[in-house]
């Protein structure tokens, strides 16, 4: 059985800085038995990550972090072991990526009035053919000397409450839960109490997601203070949700260390049992 798993990591195919192969190698060095690759709204990195399993000895749970929106509040869902060819899911991912890029162009236009940044600067940090979003804008701002790191750029310039922010289309989280469940996937609500980065989702919406088939909720996350973790634990008990811990690792530019939080192997075993595709084993 998998002993140490970090079920929330990102590669350069979305907003991380490591290739999927590098990501698995870093996981091996950190003593992890498995990771889940959860790039934003894409499965592009799955094949490369799968090819790295044998020589790294790290098992791979294939997933994605699905962007959603509820009354203007950004919601992130970790989706695991779903059919990547499911038409509804493919369409949601495509539409979200396209609208996010349109939004990014508008945000750069807003920012350029106060910061030395162009769209070409942002594209230099984005994966070729991959999604372009706020992390790549943050990297361009850091490169321009406007902020010391990604985290500072997010808090001071790219926060949803700030003057430069532009909303983009994303599916309703309850509908997204139903969509991923139809694709055979297992869903976990990511960092629901990350107060510095987002407005908080009302508990009533989380309850509706649980009723629609949400499996778990992320408790142990760097952006959750001790009191937030206790609050998530309470919600998990009341709503019958499994509790997860993860790093939300992105590589360089963010302090998150791979494996700094992990998830109980019995919880992961249930994810594997419910998923519709297999885990890639060494």
Question: What are these model-predicted stretches?
Answer:
Residues 1, 281-282:
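Polar low-complexity intrinsically disordered regions
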Residues 52-207, 262, 266-281:
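Extended substrate/RNA-proximal surfaces in nucleic-acid metabolism proteins
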């Amino acid at each position: 059985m998998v002993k140490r798993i970090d079920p929330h990591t990102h590669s350069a195919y979305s907003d991380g800085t490591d290739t999927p192969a590098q990501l698995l190698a870093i996981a091996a060095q950190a003593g992890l038995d498995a990771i889940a690759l959860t790039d934003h709204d894409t499965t592009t990195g799955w094949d490369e990550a799968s090819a790295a399993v044998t020589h790294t000895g790290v098992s791979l749970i294939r997933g994605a972090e699905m962007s959603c929106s509820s009354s203007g509040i950004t919601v992130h869902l970790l989706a695991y072991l779903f059919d990547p060819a499911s038409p509804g899911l493919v369409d949601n991912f495509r539409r979200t990526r396209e609208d996010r890029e349109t939004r990014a162009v508008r945000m750069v236009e807003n920012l350029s009035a106060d910061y030395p940044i162009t769209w070409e600067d942002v594209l230099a940090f984005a994966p070729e053919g991959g999604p372009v979003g706020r992390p790549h804008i943050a990297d361009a701002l850091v490169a321009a000397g406007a902020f010391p790191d990604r985290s500072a750029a997010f808090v001071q310039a790219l926060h949803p409450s700030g003057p430069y922010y532009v909303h983009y289309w994303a599916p309703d989280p309850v509908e997204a839960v139903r969509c991923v469940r139809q694709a055979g996937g297992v869903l976990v609500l990511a960092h629901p109490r990350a107060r510095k980065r987002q407005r908080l989702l009302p508990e009533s919406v989380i309850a509706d997601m649980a009723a629609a088939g949400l499996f778990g909720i992320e408790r142990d996350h760097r952006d959750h203070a001790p009191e937030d973790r206790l609050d998530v634990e309470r919600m998990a008990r009341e709503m019958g949700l499994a509790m997860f811990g993860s790093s939300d690792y992105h590589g360089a530019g963010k302090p998150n260390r791979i494996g700094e939080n992990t998830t109980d192997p019995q919880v992961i075993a249930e994810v594997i049992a419910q998923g519709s595709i297999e885990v890639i084993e060494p």
